[in-house]
Amino acid sequence: MDNFGFLKVAAAIPHLRVGDCDYNAERMAAMAEEAARRGVEIAAFPELGVTAYTCGDLVLQSTLLDAADEALERLVRATRKLPLTLIAGAPLRHGSALYNCAVVFTQGKVLGVVPKTYIPNYGEFYENRWFASGAGISDEHIAVAGQQADFGADLTFEVNGAEFGVELCEDLWSAAPPSSQLALNGAKVIFNLSASPEAAGKHAYLRQLVAQQSARTIAAYIYCSAGFGESTTDLVFAGNGIVAENGTILREAERFSPEEQLVVADVDLERLAFERRRNTSFRMNEGATENTVIEMEIPEGLRGVVLDRDIDPMPFVPKDEAHRSERCEEIFRIQSHGLAQRMIHTRAGKAVVGISGGLDSTLALLVTARTFDFLKMDRAGIIGITMPGFGTTDRTYNNALELMRGLGVTIREIPIRDACTQHFRDIGLDPDDRGAAYENAQARERTQILMDVANMEGGLVVGTGDLSELALGWATYNGDQMSMYGVNASVPKTLVRHLVKWAADTERDAATRATLLDIIDTPVSPELLPADAEGKIAQKTEDLVGPYELHDFFLYNFLRAGYGPAKILLLAEQAFEGSYDRATILKWLTVFVRRFFTQQFKRSAMPDGPKVGSVSLSPRGDWRMPSDASAAAWLREVEEL
């Protein structure tokens, strides 16, 4: 299991006939063959799929139980040449009791049998009438499919390095699901064989339950429930198939479909292992109880280059418009509350913000305005300073002024050309030398102005730099890298644009809305080099360091998922198919890796700022990294691509 840590799993929902074990086994065998063709490595069928769930008292009859045993044995034999592991539901006799079981088998060998722990006997459920609970069963063996196999509720399995566990239907709905302990015992994938009937409103709760359990266990959770063919005497089974991973639903079946369904997804075991390593609370309970681990190596099946998994090219930005709007509102609240507390603590009566007419300073000013409203302070106490330099264009200059007017803040204009020209003379820099000193001197001059005005006014300098700039080190050390409180420090550039768009959409003043929309359409630039012959922006950030949508994708997957360059490239190729080719992605991935390591010294000295999402580079919080760490291993991996 070395396919970048991905494991292809499936919930297989076959047509069933109640009590017709031969037919049911045939359908399951056919679906197993289809799963193998699609490269599935582990597939689960519904609860009691060999007999069907709705047999009622017939399940106590020896005739049906014998037929189930024989059909299960044929199913194990029929799939013995397939390179995948299967999990089928069947009623099995053990001692004097009958158990509702999940049978795990591969290559003609039964690896183990897991009995259902929680036997529901309420509402429409009467399972206690037929089945015994598997609670407490451990270290036992059971006769199944002509073999002797391990039998117990505590079994975990490891096939080709992929660790998984099994529970059945009601087990998930209980206060202490067996899957929680299975996960603590090492299972990164949980399969649930279910036969859960429909009821109005129940499906939404089921989705939440599956997603939540996958999050709580930091695992992949594959839920496979009975569908077409179960008896509708009193109940309806819609055929729910859900694949979730650490709180996110990856794939779902079509409910109430008359067709057989194979719900396939690639789950990311590498990501799950990373999350468990970083989650100290999870580690505190690992291995708390002893359990039986059954290991097996089997030939690998077909593997496709394209993953059965949606790869989000914008991982920081919610896809759904309603969710995105809600997220933007929440982020603004976090930013403004963070700034409000800092202003109260420092007794700052005013805020000073450098306004360039670009996205970041616009967001910082919007946050500051909300902060003053929250504190019931006059927005006139916000001092917005525009500082035209050698590269300032009419478009950004006018947008800066219009934005400040629209928000009702105090406007100051302090050009920096003369001060920088004098500074160039003082240090002996030829103004025609447009290197780092030429650019950075302007950024530091602006920061000096902001700091000095803040001292004069008893105010606080609000920083504008964003998370993407911090990751790339695209900021002047002790220039725009420095402030007294950085409200955008954990907001990536791709999200900044959406936050400003949300502000525009909720802005009542038409002129201010128009200004915000034009700022969104303006190319990202530090404007430290002179404009072109037409007075337009000549220095475009994304031409120099690469597209921010790529860098934010790299950043999220590097930090939040712990991936290396090879896996990030694989995912980026799929996420940005049709937008960027492999060579382009690899070029900017190399830039990202190199700059991320070499620019850590700027992050080590970054000012305070609020964390707003799952990724932050604060050296006091989420990211602890020495400024002189070597990037050799990561760059070597890039070079090998």
Regions found by a protein language model. Name each.
Residues 19, 24, 160, 219, ...:
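ATP/NTP-dependent adenylation/nucleotidyl-transfer catalytic domains that generate, transfer
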Residues 1-354, 370-379, 411:
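Enzyme catalytic cores with a strong preference for nitrogen-chemistry domains
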